[in-house]
């Protein structure tokens, strides 16, 4: 029988550039890497998350899936994001900075230029960049195959 390790505090994991490939967040895959995430834990995605691209069935599927995860995903905008769609969500205060709750308290966009206090640590959200693969940094959402 496996013995569960008791942790005294939450964990903060950092990754980036998921580009809509959310298989790395499956419980089975996380367990294989030794990660047993709880409701106190956070995963910070440093840009190009890929969730908010179009409000379609895929978006709804992933929203439902992430809402059922025990942990919270925090995400900073990258250069491949649908900024118009993100802008539809209201700005709110959270842990000292401005955020947009994309999926209730499960997926939270950390606004650029903000400082957040999370578990006694300070995090500065510095996201976005010019797109080397999109002319002028402007994309027609309907013509771009994302992810």
Language model region names:
Residues 12-20, 141-146:
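Acidic/glycine-enriched edge-of-secondary-structure segments
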Residues 105, 119-147:
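Active-site-proximal loop/helix segment associated with metal-binding centers of metalloenzymes
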Residues 2, 7-8, 15, 20-118:
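Core catalytic region of metal-dependent phosphoesterases/phosphodiesterases
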């Amino acid at each position: 029988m496996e013995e569960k390790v008791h942790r005294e505090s939450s964990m903060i994991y950092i990754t980036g550039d998921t580009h809509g490939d959310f298989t790395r967040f499956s419980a089975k895959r996380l367990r294989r890497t030794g990660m047993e995430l709880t409701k106190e834990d956070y995963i910070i995605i440093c840009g190009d998350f890929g969730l908010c691209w179009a409000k379609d069935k895929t978006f709804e599927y992933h929203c439902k899936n992430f809402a059922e995860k025990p942990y919270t995903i925090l995400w900073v905008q990258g250069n491949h994001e649908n900024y118009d769609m993100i802008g539809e969500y209201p700005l709110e205060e959270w842990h000292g900075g401005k955020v947009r709750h994309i999926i209730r308290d499960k997926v939270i966009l950390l606004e650029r230029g903000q400082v957040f206090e999370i578990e006694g640590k300070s995090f500065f959200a510095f996201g976005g960049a010019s797109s080397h693969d999109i002319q002028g940094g402007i994309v027609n959402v309907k013509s771009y195959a994302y992810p």
